[in-house]
Structure formats: structure tokens, C-alpha cells
């Protein structure tokens, strides 16, 4: 449905190659999650975000060894190397893409930019609204590890 409606970049939160291969079959780009999808769809897959659970497992095992409580609400990210990017598919990426990714990554780690940065407005499926002012951002996962962004951002196309 997304591709039919004109979406030219597909991503997913699944452990399946189906979005990547579907993107390739339809001539659109794909950004993976949890697995590098370049082998599955070399003409469509640009890059993937991945989680390094080894960092959490190491902390949990160390907590057990030390007789401490195992952390169950765990928040780590790019700066902690708990989230990382697979290598960029340089065979299909535009010139300068790696440099742009590196710059954005540095700014995210330093806190210079944020994922949900204002100004933006959104509405949750329950009708709750949020408005983030210029210069402010949504503080997701600072107090809990579960994703908490559930808003449809004003101006985004919703496909049902």
C-alpha cells in the first residue's frame, strides 16, 4: 500500500526480508532494522539500524556476579554503541551519503540534534495532541526503555 501510494523509501520494524525484497521488486529504497538487508536486496537496501544486545547481556551478567539487581528498564543508544548502523550500501547510495550520515550521527550523539525536534505537532490514535516548540524536543526514553512516541506528525501521509 505504501509503495502504491508513492512512498519511495521503505523501512520496517520486523525481522523479515520481505520489506527489503518488496522494495527491490518495486524499484524503491529500503532501510533495514535489526539485520543488514543488503544481501537480501542489494539494489534497494541502503543501510540498517541494529541493536547490540551484548552490551545489555554483559551488564546483566555483571549485575548477577556482583549480587545486584539486573536492569530491566535499560536505555542506551548511539553514544553507548548499543545502537549502530550497518555499513552503507555504497553501490547504490548517492555520493556524499556516508558523510551526511556521519555528521548526523555525531550531532545525535552530542545532543545537537534530536529525533523528534520542534517545531512539530502530532496526534495520538486516542486523539491526544502534542506540540513541540522550536528549539525543544520530545524526550523519549530518558526515563524508560519502551518507545513512547505514538503521535502521527502533522503533514505526514497516513495510509490505512
Predicted regions and their residues:
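A residue-level marker of the well-folded mature domains of exported/periplasmic proteins
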Residues: 1-160
Amino acid at each position: 500500500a505504501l509503495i502504491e501510494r508513492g512512498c519511495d523509501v521503505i523501512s520496517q520494524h520486523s525481522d523479515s526480508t520481505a520489506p527489503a525484497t518488496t522494495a527491490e521488486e518495486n524499484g524503491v529504497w529500503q532501510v533495514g532494522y535489526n539485520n543488514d538487508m543488503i544481501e537480501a536486496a542489494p539494489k534497494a537496501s541502503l543501510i540498517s539500524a541494529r541493536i547490540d544486545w551484548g552490551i545489555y547481556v554483559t551488564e546483566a551478567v555483571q549485575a548477577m556476579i556482583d549480587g545486584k539487581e539486573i536492569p530491566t528498564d535499560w536505555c542506551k543508544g548511539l553514544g553507548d554503541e548499543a545502537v549502530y548502523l550497518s555499513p552503507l550500501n555504497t553501490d547504490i547510495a548517492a555520493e556524499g551519503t556516508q558523510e551526511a550520515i556521519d555528521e548526523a550521527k555525531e550531532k545525535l550523539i552530542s545532543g545537537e540534534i534530536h529525533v523528534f525536534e520542534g517545531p512539530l505537532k502530532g496526534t495520538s490514535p486516542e486523539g491526544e495532541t502534542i506540540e513541540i516548540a522550536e528549539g525543544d524536543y520530545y524526550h523519549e526514553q530518558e526515563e524508560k526503555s519502551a518507545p513512547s512516541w505514538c503521535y502521527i506528525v502533522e503533514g505526514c501521509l497516513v495510509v490505512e
